[in-house]
A protein has these predicted regions:
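Short helix-boundary/capping micro-motifs
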Residues: 11-31
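A short LG(V/I)-centered, amphipathic sequence patch enriched
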Residues: 40-62
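Short beta-strand-centered segments that line the small-molecule binding cleft or hinge
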Residues: 73, 85, 108-112, 129-167, ...
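Central regulatory/effector-binding core of bacterial HTH transcription factors
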Residues: 90-151, 216, 223-224
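A late-sequence structural motif
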Residues: 105, 259-301
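Hydrophobic hinge/microswitch elements
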Residues: 128-141, 147, 199-257
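Secondary-structure junction motif
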Residues: 147, 177-183, 191-213, 280-288, ...
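Beta-alpha-beta core module
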Residues: 153-160, 165, 180, 228-277
């Protein structure tokens, strides 16, 4: 395989049409077809099948596409970092952050780095870990800061624990539960909830707690990964939600209280996720160093 072959494959896989790919890459269609045949012969497998006027990637083709996209991203990162070093800049840090990290720890870390290195450029994407880690695997993010998965055995990822916290049931201070001392799991199951997507660990834990008690999954009112939307909606309705003890102490959670049940408290560990075989840029290393200092400052919880 050579780089030109992989570029041609990427153009073909993204367009799913040999004619369009050939035009985009300024090559004749017979020339592109010949290059793709040679690549498939070298790999010993078919990368695509013809379907009408287009093509459809095989499983091998989809696997190669993931790696070629990652390679292109890493080459762009290398180019940016080398140019940054040459110009005296430390480069670009692309960070994915979970909701509870956006209001204090991450901004404090970024501010510290900017104070010492004003030429660093940050891009921050927000959301829950499942989606962000997917982007990390594709090379679209350098690191993800947020909740760590229970299973941390992954050949492609590196995990660094920074803190732990407790996820609790919350609602507005006027919620009927605030005046009800005895609350059963069935009471909670009968409420309407604001929750993240089904793929998120915290929602799976909640569903499992109800299942073990022989109850149906919670009634979903709003599905969102936006902390601000969740808190605002909780203040205006009698819905329930889940958030960390740390969030409850912050100004943005004013008017929101814990409405605990012992079966619905979940310990969560949080930290930094990065690609195991990727070299982190100086700017990303600076942010990680500051996050570690802040984790020590505020303690393990």
């Amino acid at each position: 395989m050579d780089y030109r072959q992989l570029q041609l494959f990427l153009a073909t896989a993204e367009r799913l049409n040999l004619s369009h790919a050939a035009e985009a890459m300024s090559i004749t269609q017979p020339g592109l077809s010949k290059s793709m045949h040679r690549l498939q012969r070298e790999l010993g497998t078919r990368l695509y099948h013809r379907r009408g006027r287009g093509i459809e990637l095989t499983e091998s083709g989809r696997a190669l596409l993931r790696h070629v996209k990652l390679m292109e991203t890493q080459l762009a990162d290398a180019r940016s970092e080398v140019m940054g070093i040459a110009s005296g800049k430390l480069g670009h840090a692309r960070i994915g952050a979970g909701p509870s990290w956006l209001s204090r720890h991450l901004p404090e870390s970024i501010a510290r780095v900017m104070g010492e290195h004003p030429n660093v450029h940050f891009t921050v994407d927000t959301g829950f870990p499942d989606r962000l880690i997917g982007r990390l695997r594709l090379g679209e993010l350098d690191v993800v800061v947020g909740a760590l998965p229970d299973n941390r055995v992954d050949p492609d990822l590196r995990f660094m624990r920074l803190s732990s916290d407790v996820i609790r049931v919350v609602g507005r201070k006027e919620h009927p539960f605030a005046r009800k001392r005895e609350r059963t799991l069935a009471d909670y199951a009968a409420q309407r909830w604001i929750l993240p997507g089904r793929q998120e660990l915290v929602r799976q834990r909640l569903a499992r707690a109800f299942m073990l008690a022989g109850l149906a999954e919670p009634i979903l009112a709003v599905e969102t990964d936006s902390l601000s939307l969740k808190l605002a909606t909780l203040r205006m309705t009698d819905c329930l939600g889940l958030t960390t003890t740390q969030i409850l102490t912050q100004e943005e959670a004013q008017g929101i209280i814990a409405l605990d049940h012992e079966a619905l408290q979940f310990r969560r560990e949080a930290g930094i996720v990065s690609r195991r075989h990727a070299e982190l840029s100086p700017s990303v290393k600076l942010v990680i160093a500051e996050l570690r200092k802040i984790a020590v400052k505020y303690g393990p919880n």
